[in-house]
UniProtKB/Swiss-Prot annotation:
GO molecular function: ditrans,polycis-undecaprenyl-diphosphate synthase [(2E,6E)-farnesyl-diphosphate specific] activity; magnesium ion binding; manganese ion binding
GO biological process: polyprenol biosynthetic process
Binding site for Mg(2+): D32, E219
Record keyword Magnesium present: yes
Domain of life, per lineage: Bacteria
Active site residues per record: D32, N80 (proton acceptor)
EC number: 2.5.1.-
Gene designation per UniProt: uppS
GO CC annotations, alphabetized: cytosol
The protein's name in its UniProt record: Isoprenyl transferase
Record-listed substrate binding positions: 33-37, 45, 49, 77-79, 81, 83, 200, 206-208
Organism: Listeria monocytogenes serovar 1/2a (strain ATCC BAA-679 / EGD-e)
Primary enzyme class: transferase
Known partners and oligomeric status: Homodimer.
Length: 252
């Protein structure tokens, strides 16, 4: 059944994209608006998060169908611990439910799970679910489904700089030998490449401490659609918009 869904998505999506224009290799998404979606419907915030989890599954299918290599999703920031305890507790249970229900299907479609963030600070049940999903899909070589979980861009840069400096010291080198490449090697996203396209839902025009180093030359796409309402058409529109932009990377 899962393969059939992927094949259907592939046929529909690819038929609407320009064949002679590139698709982004790495797409990152700030999944915003779960709470506002729920409030609009007089539902508790956790209802929005639950609905948002189902959208993650659909968007993963879309990304895999059109040949995207890496899909990075901002799931939980280092600042999100400040939210009400009951909401945080629910959010920490979502990965358990998500991976338990979705990993068998991801394996069938050759999708690898990766999680970047300060995993050591996650609750034990969340950590176990994350580590199991990573281990169970480690052999997969297709799309990398990368979750930013307990992640913060500023902290990541500081951590990477410290680790890079320690490595330089062991090599008998100084701070003058620190390069972008050396720092990049110690980022949590090392090996995944920088995002080509950032999508943010729910109309907010900010990065919220997400991949601050990696987004330096990414194309940004903002939509007013709340994440639980993010559809195949919304995803397609973002990709089409990317295809029609000219990336200069600081040049002419």
């Amino acid at each position: 059944m899962f393969k059939k869904l992927f094949r259907q998505d592939e046929n529909i999506l690819n038929s609407e994209l320009a064949e002679d224009l590139p698709i982004p290799r790495h797409v990152a998404i700030i999944m915003d608006g779960n709470g506002r979606w729920a409030k609009k419907r007089f539902l508790p915030r956790i209802a929005g998060h639950k609905e948002g989890m189902d959208v993650v599954k659909r968007v993963t299918r879309y990304a895999n169908a059109i040949g995207i290599d890496v899909l990075t999703l901002y799931a939980f920031s280092t600042e999100n611990w400040k939210r009400p305890t009951d909401e945080v507790d629910f959010l920490m249970k979502l990965p358990v439910e998500f991976f338990d229900s979705f990993v068998p299907e991801l394996i069938e479609e050759n999708v690898r799970v990766n999680v970047m963030g300060y995993r050591e600070n996650l609750p034990d049940h969340t950590m176990r679910a994350v580590e199991k999903a990573i281990a169970d899909t480690a052999h997969c070589t297709g799309l990398t489904l990368n979750f930013a979980l307990n992640y913060g861009g500023r902290s990541e840069i500081i951590t990477a700089a410290k680790e890079a400096m320690k490595e330089l010291e062991l090599e008998g080198k100084s701070a003058d030998d620190l390069t972008e490449e050396k720092l990049n090697d110690h980022l949590m996203s090392s090996g995944l490449g920088d995002p080509d396209l950032l999508i943010r839902t729910s109309g907010e025009l900010r990065l919220s401490n997400f991949m601050l180093w990696q987004l330096a030359y990414s194309e940004f796409y903002f939509t007013d659609t709340h994440w639980p309402d993010f559809s195949k058409e919304d995803f397609l529109q973002a990709i089409i918009e990317y295809q029609n932009r000219s990336r200069r990377f600081g040049g002419l």
